[in-house]
Amino acid sequence: MKKAIFSTEISLLRSTMQRLLRRRAHTNISKILRKTHQADVALIMRSLSQYDQKKIFSLCPTSLHKARLLEELDDSLIEKVLEHESEKNISKIFRYLDTNDQATIIGMFPDSKQQEILTKIEVDDKDDVEEIMSYPDDSAGSVMTKETFTLNQNTTVKESIKKLQSFPENDKIFYLYVLDNKEKLVGVVSLRTLVTSKNSKKLKEIMIKDIQAATTSTDQEEVAKKVAQYNYLALPVVNRQNKFLGIVTIDDVVDIIREEASEDFLQMAGVGKDREILLKSPIENAQSRAPWILASLIGGICAAGIISYFNSLLEQIIVLAAFIPVIIGVGGNVGTQSSTIVVRGLATGRVDAANTFPLIFKELLVGSILGVAYGLVVGFAAEYITGIDMSNLGLVIGLSIFCSMTIATAVGASVPIVLKKLGFDPAISTGPFVTTAIDIIGVALYFVIASTILIN
């Protein structure tokens, strides 16, 4: 069994591979690929040119090795290495892939090539692949595997163990799923329970009847939550009639969690939700990030318009301009903190309809406490920093910071919840849209308070 290696060895392997590629020592490369774990090869390929990526893939010693490497590669790299592969070669590789992996890879190709590949894969696999491809993206149906072990509820323990031993896909067996005569899921048996039960007992006597399952349309994020909540190694997938269709395994769940977390982090940073952004070209990268920057630009123009509206006030009291960055900064930061906390709570299931209002009130209280503390500090400091003898200047600055931070926490906490109820991804609430809105509100409040107290 090949073992995974550490980062220092990865660096050494990468430099060795690059040197051998330059020397065109293809035989040596094949020998290294045979001995190296595919996950490590996939990691190395990220830093290679597209030509070298294809060369490494072509030098894999067997179709089985290529299949295992495809399982580890990023989606964008899979497209590149298979781009010029013939449908015949792809079908050979597919013999060693699960049907859900086959469906995912076929979905990357144009429709014409999809049909050509489907005609060349095995008949049994073809039906399963076409079924998986028919389900919506990011649903349980689209990520389930059909290679699983099921038995009728009237099967004895002795017969079950015998059939289990002869099952070809035994690396996918986490649980034994029990079906009735209509292929409906009626129970589940752990392998431990199976081997410790009497041979004469039937599965319906030892199975667990209270089953957690997903339907084909269940969002993959909900599947991941169920697996994490109940510590399952796999989750069964059924249709609306409770007919058993397949399972989502723990390795797929790990991938789902990683993908969803990456999407959330990217959206929270305001760079879209493309998980492969690091592997995109500069032009593609700029295109995905441009809309988010545009939101900040529009917000900045709005803030500039508000400042221009109060131009006469600034002409009279120019020192007010010095504290605009402070007002914007504290409001934006505390608002982002609140929205991040709520987004994380929604993702983990700790925030729901039952505790929505208490949570918003709690964040509002946090914003008020921080607003009082920082408002007092900056308000008193303003009198000394400016060196201007102006009554109520500190009051204006302190009150503006208090209002900005209080409102920012309320907005930051409530917007993700509202977006969730409207069916949008709440992660976008921590991006430029909300922070820009908080900046505009903060600037407007600052000048309204200043004009009210200092002029009137």
Can you annotate each of these PLM segments?
Residues 261-410, 414-428, 432-436, 445-456:
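Alpha-helical transmembrane segments and their membrane-interface boundaries
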Residues 440-441:
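Active-site His/Glu-centered metal-binding helix of metallohydrolases
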Residues 1-272:
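Hydrophobic packing positions in regular secondary-structure scaffolds
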